[in-house]
């Protein structure tokens, strides 16, 4: 059974219980979609906790962070499935690694208590816009 439904709308208008999006692990300032989300849900801005050039403050690839309480704060899932921003170009952040990290993030999401009774909105082409992934491959992981 396919649970993927593509909706042509602004992600910020989504009515789903969770919004999940792909993040990189090192940026200290959000751009593009992450900036839009963090501007609207500042409690989910993991980038502002980071210190430039301090690896101890970076996120770890293949992990997720969940922000919000589902009541007064909408749930936001930050999926750390790329190490650097933009397209993959370094040996420690390859296209294959990003795909693997994305899969691992999906596994973490599947283990959220009561997730089977919840809905999740993700941006169309997640992992494939500025990150440069192949939607034909990524979309299959979501179905």
Regions found by a protein language model. Give the residues of each.
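Macrodomain-like recognition of ADP-ribose-binding/processing modules
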Residues: 1-143
């Amino acid at each position: 059974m396919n649970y993927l439904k593509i909706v042509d709308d602004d992600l910020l208008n989504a009515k789903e219980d969770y919004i999940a999006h792909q993040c990189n692990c090192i940026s200290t300032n959000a751009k593009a979609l992450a900036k839009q989300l963090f501007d609207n849900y500042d409690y989910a801005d993991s980038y502002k906790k980071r210190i430039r050039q301090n690896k101890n403050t970076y996120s770890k690839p293949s992990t997720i962070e969940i922000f919000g309480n589902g009541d007064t704060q909408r749930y936001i899932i930050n999926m750390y499935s790329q190490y650097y921003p933009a397209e993959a170009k370094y040996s420690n952040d390859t296209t294959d690694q990003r795909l693997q990290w994305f899969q691992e993030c999906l596994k973490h999401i599947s283990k959220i208590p009561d997730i089977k009774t919840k809905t999740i909105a993700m941006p169309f082409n997640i992992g494939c816009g500025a990150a440069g992934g192949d939607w034909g491959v990524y979309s299959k992981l979501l179905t």
